[in-house]
């Protein structure tokens, strides 16, 4: 067990999931250089550019590709720079990822994790600082997760990655540097620590 920050806990959970399951992939802007806030640092070097995928700046295309990957058997993790940009991909999130299971009688599951950083942060403009968790919670078919502590961020990200449903995973930007309790990895059985 180790004391780590909120951001480090999520990075550890994602790295462990990628080591355990080759179907877990990550895609988004600038992930190869570690992500906008450093939360993907070192992952492309470890897993390669075909599993940590740098994308063009087109949120609708990123999300559409991730929905297709999920339907084809992968477990994509989509990184949006901020939650506000997810609104550029709202059709893919609301009408495709969230509804697929219902449209195809449970046969079209979309095991997708959308990491959407929320909240105000130093030098962020108004269109980079929203908290839309309540809005997403009103969309049938989406699971909304907002971890509060480093242990939450570790356990809930692993549980989200194991879920068969699309998960809107909202980390508050102001929490990334917060150190927390020791991360209890030994208590996690298989890939799930806390069900979502």
Task: Put a short name on every predicted segment.
Residues 1-168, 174-175, 180:
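Thiamine diphosphate
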Residues 181-185:
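A short, charged helix-loop
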Residues 186, 190-196:
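Single conserved hydrophobic/aromatic residue that forms the stacking wall/gate
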